Amino acid sequence: GFKVNNYPYYDAASHGVNFTGMLAALNSMPARTIVVLHACCHNPTGVDLSNEQWKQIVATVKARELVPFLDMAYQGFGDNIESDGSAVRMFANAGISCLVSSSFSKSFSLYGERVGALSIITASKDETAKVLSQLKRVIRTNYSNPPTHGGTVVAAVLNSPELRATWETELGEMRDRIKLMRNLLVSKLKAAGIERDFSFVNTQRGMFSYSGLTSEQVDRLRNEFGIYAVGTGRICVAALNNKNIDYVADAIAKVLK
């Protein structure tokens, strides 16, 4: 199997990206190293790279001859479908062969179907033929024929201008609701008298947030209030709604005091 290493990404002190550490790690990697990058709506932190940072990543990957594997499970949950795909286009325009793993489970509310796609950008027709041959072998020995129901649903929507327009509108509503929940959580924590600045939650994107809560505080949320979060402090913002936001904010305020 592959030897798997980690590279620096999240900076807890600034609630942002440790970009200096990330670049240093990329520059230390041997050529042909596969590097997994989140194209948008970073999971679990919710902290994304800026366009300028992506440009530096693309240049570094090209110079070091690395192999980017772009994980794009939440396209459309950041700004919009077009903007959220900008990192993929940067690699393609730079002539870099890369792999793109897309998921439609969340954006189409087909979580139980596990619908996705693997797209591979190659440098030539000859490389395409070789990659396709290897993919067929891997697929044949792993699952041979995938379930078709979820994929058929997604294809029907994307190939119909009317259905696609409706889907994009509804996806935008989902995105706006999540952003609203972020805003409400921040404002309600402030109203509860919490002096810690949680404004960073509003700058994060996608379904998740690194809240800054400790594992002990997360345990208290679970044991005392029946609110579940990951031990790292990651919370699912998409699980918040108008009926539970007050309860959650009040509980977080209590474990912080």
Features from the language model and the residues they span:
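Structural signature of PLP-dependent enzymes
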Residues: L132-G151, V157-V186
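Conserved PLP-binding catalytic core of the aspartate aminotransferase-like
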Residues: T166-E224
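Active-site phosphate-binding strand-loop segment of PLP-dependent enzymes
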Residues: Y9-F77
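Active-site PLP attachment segment
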Residues: D84-K130, Q134
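Substrate-binding/gating loop at the entrance of the active-site cleft, primarily
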Residues: G1-F2
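PLP-dependent enzyme catalytic core of the Aspartate aminotransferase-like
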Residues: L23, D126, S187-A191, L213-K257
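Alpha-helical scaffolding segments of alpha/beta enzyme cores, especially the outer helices
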Residues: A24, E52-A59, S86-M90, L184, ...
